[in-house]
Regions:
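A short, basic N-terminal segment
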Residues: 1-54, 398-434
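C-terminal alpha-helical "lid" subdomain
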Residues: 172-190, 312-316, 326-434
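Amphipathic alpha-helical segments in well-structured domains
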Residues: 38, 70, 102-106, 255, ...
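The catalytic "switch" region of P-loop NTPases
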Residues: 4, 8-9, 185-238, 242-354
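P-loop NTPase nucleotide-binding core
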Residues: 57-60, 64, 68-231, 393-397, ...
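Eukaryote-specific, cytoplasm-facing alpha-helical/coiled-coil scaffolding segments in long proteins
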Residues: 68, 135-138, 246, 409-417
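Gly/Ser/Thr-rich loops at beta-strand to alpha-helix junctions
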Residues: 62-67, 244-245, 377
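Conserved phosphate/pyrophosphate-binding and hydrolysis machinery centered on Walker-type P-loop NTPases
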Residues: 31-35, 63, 99, 121, ...
């Protein structure tokens, strides 16, 4: 590796991998394979930036690299001037609910709202201020009031659900901006983040009659996608991971309500009615294929998401909504370990702590311990390799051959939890006894 790597990027990548989590930055330093899949998502991003829409379900076994892939797509989208909202689903965050779980998902998306200049989240206020700053400049040039320009620019949002109130909230933020009223600005951001739980509180604070509730989160995302384009960005990409949590819902009605929301998003995307808005969803094969609990249990989704019957054997088709991630091969994993070695050395080949033969020997050692799992679900294997490099770095003169036999490699069994089903409300026959 000849590219010099900044210590900040090195530490970010290595600390994340050592802890068994996916790095939020620097993914390009350790990316291997998946060229066609990445090209497919980049084409989606370009289409969204051109005012179109996108919808992809990224499917892969536990440990196949879904989260890494989604984070890589997220980074590419921000480089292309898209705003990215990302969140993991869990029992308290869903696409559809009646107990606040959907609003909780929306609030998490807004907390994680990211741009190229603010990649770690919390970008909502900056986006609003960028829109207002542009409006103020135009208002000054035309000799008009800033609020009049804002109202004019947001006028076409009023055709959407909550559009009038959205415009009122942006205007309220502008007043707070001009008057130095921090409380008014904070209240406007609270509304935009979906943090008001009652309409009464929102009306008292901002004079608006609606709030972001469980039923309106998708409509609010459509509003936001148009707004970020008015603020000078290319569009909005919504990245949702851990959709297996919908598969794990025990209550059939709750599951189907969430799948119905996914169908609505998919239909809008296919019909082109969502402007500058894209969705990328990450899940396991069970979440997609299970005929009783997965997306395929919902007939309308099965017909839209089914695989091209001609894509068999080595033939692939990336034009459909589903992108299937295959597991890494031993060759891919070898390249990955080489890249990790390079990151550890800050890109300086003269500082590599193990030679290529050492990587081969490490892979053979892992294969003897846990078989194919060492490259198919490589989380624990990567952690062990980084631990080995850390010992070699901090103990100069130690031979890697002496340490190899003592390297502990365990199979990654975290995927077993994905098949467990929540006992929330119970299925129809959950307690049936003979």
């Amino acid at each position: 590796m000849t590219t010099t790597i900044r210590p900040k990027d090195r530490d970010s990548v290595l600390q994340s991998l050592r802890a068994g989590v996916v790095p939020r930055a620097g993914q390009h330093l350790i990316q291997v394979g998946r060229t066609r899949e990445i090209e497919t998502l980049v084409n989606d991003i370009d289409r969204i930036a051109d005012g179109g829409s996108g919808f992809r379900v990224v499917i892969g076994e536990y440990g196949a690299g879904k989260t890494f892939f989604l984070n890589l797509v997220r980074a590419v989208a921000m480089e292309r001037k898209l705003v990215v909202a990302s969140a993991d689903l869990n029992p308290d965050r869903r696409l559809h609910a009646s107990g606040g779980q959907a609003r909780s998902l929306y609030a998490e998306l807004m907390r994680n709202l990211s741009t190229r200049t603010k990649p770690e989240g919390g970008a909502l206020a900056g986006i609003v201020e960028k829109f207002i700053a542009t409006a103020k400049a135009d208002a000054k040039a035309q000799g008009l009031a800033t609020e009049a320009i804002i109202r004019e620019r947001l006028s076409h949002l009023t055709e959407l659900v909550n559009g009038y109130d959205f415009a009122d909230v942006i205007a309220a933020y502008c007043r707070g901006f001009e008057e130095g009223n921090e409380e008014l600005k904070a209240n406007a951001i609270r509304w935009l983040r979906g943090e008001y739980s009652t309409k009464t509180d929102a009306r008292q604070a901002l004079g608006v009659r609606s709030i972001v509730d469980d039923a309106s989160i998708y409509d609010q995302l459509k509003l936001l996608s148009r707004f970020v384009r008015l603020a000078g960005f290319s569009g909005l990409l919504v990245s949702l991971d851990e959709l297996v949590n919908l598969y794990k819902l025990a209550n059939t009605q709750a599951r189907n309500s969430n799948y119905e929301q996914i169908l609505r998003i998919l239909n809008d995307s296919l019909q082109g009615s969502a402007e500058g808005l894209g969705f990328v969803l990450g899940g396991t094969p069970e979440f997609l294929l299970d005929p009783r609990r997965g997306l395929y249990s919902y007939p309308a989704l099965q017909s839209r998401l089914s695989q091209n019957s001609f894509a068999t054997g080595e033939l692939v088709d990336f034009s459909g909504p589903v992108v299937r991630l295959s597991s890494l091969t031993p060759e891919d994993f070898y390249v990955l370990l080489q890249k990790i070695r390079g990151v550890f050395a800050l890109g300086d080949e003269s500082k590599h702590l193990v030679p290529d033969q050492g990587i081969f020997s490490f892979m053979e050692h892992c294969s003897k311990r846990i078989g194919d799992a060492y490259f198919r679900t490589p989380r624990t294997t990567i952690t062990s390799f980084i631990n080995l490099l850390a010992i070699l770095e901090q103990n100069p003169g130690t031979a890697w051959q002496e340490l190899l036999g003592g390297v502990e490699v365990l199979a990654d069994t975290g995927g077993n939890a994905d098949l467990a089903v929540d006992g929330e409300d119970g299925d129809e026959f959950a307690s049936f006894k003979m």
